[in-house]
Amino acid sequence: METGSTEQMVQYGKYVYVNCWSYQNRILKIDTTTDKVVDQLTVGIQPTSLVMDKNFKMWTITAGGYKGSPYGYEEPSLYRIDAETFKIEKLFKVLLGDAPSEVQLNGAGDELYWINKDIWRMSVDAERVPVRPFLKYRDTKYYGLTVSPKNGDVYVADAIDYQQQGMIYRYTEDGELVDEFYVGIIPGAFCWK
């Protein structure tokens, strides 16, 4: 089976789910006892992130491709997928031309965050996306995002111009800027112990 490039994985029971990102539109279900793909789910073009919330719902956001792409161009979307049934429960459309990415969860698994120019946040139980962002765009190149599992602080990576040292901004869960510091070039991922 051709998978293209894969991006992220989450586990539910004996299954691992992985999103196929580059020029793909699938999430694969892999049985960890046999290491075989046992199912696949079609979503929008280029699912960029994959997380599992407190209700055992998976979330992915699709990039939608780009104008002129041989693979296609469509509205990006945020998907809520039931891990037990491996079915799409809810689809939240994003505007054509937007570039959403970096779906993350807080430590409790009940608040979802993502980048779409601004930083957005919503409850995993919400039935619609918010109308106002959690953090407004600051004339930056938001490139990475994470939420501290211990205290809920939100860390945003800024690639600046993709040539110089990047910047990390740390906000409280209420959106108050508490720290900023330089890091290496093009910061794009975080890891928690």
Identify what each model region corresponds to:
Residues 1, 35-41, 87-95, 128-138, ...:
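A short beta-strand motif characteristic of beta-propeller blades
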Residues 4-11, 45-53, 97-107, 139-147, ...:
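Repeated scaffold domains used in trafficking and secretory/extracellular systems
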Residues 13-14, 55-57, 108-110, 150-152:
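Short coil/turn segments that connect the beta-strands within blades of beta-propeller domains
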Residues 18, 59-62, 113-115, 156:
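Residue position within the beta-strands of beta-propeller blades
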Residues 22-25, 64-69, 118-120, 160-164:
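Short glycine/acidic-enriched loop and turn motifs that connect beta-strands
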Residues 26-29, 76-79, 118-120, 167-169:
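A short loop-to-beta-strand structural motif that recurs across blades of beta-propeller domains
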Residues 31, 82, 123-125, 169-172:
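Structural recognition of the beta-propeller blade-terminating site
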Residues 167-193:
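Blade-level signature of beta-propeller repeat domains, shared across WD40, Kelch, NHL, RCC1
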